[in-house]
Amino acid sequence: MATTEKTKALVLFSGGQDSTVCLASVLARYDEVETVGFDYGQAHAVELGCRAKLRDALTRFPGWGAKLGPDHMIALPELGRISETALTRDVEIEMGENGLPTTFVPGRNLLFFTYAAALGYRRGASVIVGGMCETDYSGYPDCRADTIAALERAICLGMDRAFTLETPLMRIDKAATWALAHELGGDALVDLIIEETHSCYRGDRSKRHDWGYGCGTCPACELRARGYTAYLAGKA
């Protein structure tokens, strides 16, 4: 992770575990880094409130402070209005009739990358980074590697500019994501992720677990908890 690439990167940064590990990974590898968040009326919007504190904390890690540039926030209220999902409505978190969980927001990652590329076009950022993962994911079709590859080609063609859509976590599971955090920033980064990132779909930060805050029963909490347990077992 010591190699630094002289390219500006723009990170999709939600304030969650995965996007925070991605941001740390990018800060370790690129000279200039900016972040972008999206407010689409998500039920777990509490994660957006974590972003500023996380960004500030990451600047204190050796060599990262000078690299982290401006943060951007894009409002996408219409996405929330047209989406009948557990993240945008009072809908039970369960498996839907279409074989996808009700937490799937159709088009979300497609829009995120497209808006980020449009911003990157103006900001001179040719690398757009997201925390999508198809190893531990919930079956979301917009988290698959082939989806991201197709979208990258479409964005490059549609904007007539070379962009790279980078997904550092695509092939690793949640335990390996915790391990990557430790590799990048040691116990300090792992502790930061536990205390300040948010994953819970219900937006619950009233309960503190070994792995962080959350309801403990939604799919996001269960995945994070299992990954943390496996990570600790791997260290033993």
From Swiss-Prot:
The lineage of its organism: Bacteria, Pseudomonadati, Pseudomonadota, Alphaproteobacteria, Hyphomicrobiales. Pfam families: QueC. GO terms for biological process: queuosine biosynthetic process. Belongs to the QueC family. Pathway: Purine metabolism; 7-cyano-7-deazaguanine biosynthesis. Its cofactor is Zn(2+). ATP binds at residues 13-23. The gene is queC. Catalyzes the ATP-dependent conversion of 7-carboxy-7-deazaguanine (CDG) to 7-cyano-7-deazaguanine (preQ(0)). Its EC number is 6.3.4.20. Zn(2+) binds at residues 200, 215, 218, 221. This is 7-cyano-7-deazaguanine synthase. Keywords: ATP-binding, Ligase, Metal-binding, Nucleotide-binding, Queuosine biosynthesis, Zinc. GO terms for molecular function: ATP binding; ligase activity, forming carbon-nitrogen bonds; zinc ion binding. The keyword Metal-binding applies. The keyword Chloroplast does not apply. Binds 1 zinc ion per subunit. It catalyses: 7-carboxy-7-deazaguanine + NH4(+) + ATP = 7-cyano-7-deazaguanine + ADP + phosphate + H2O + H(+).
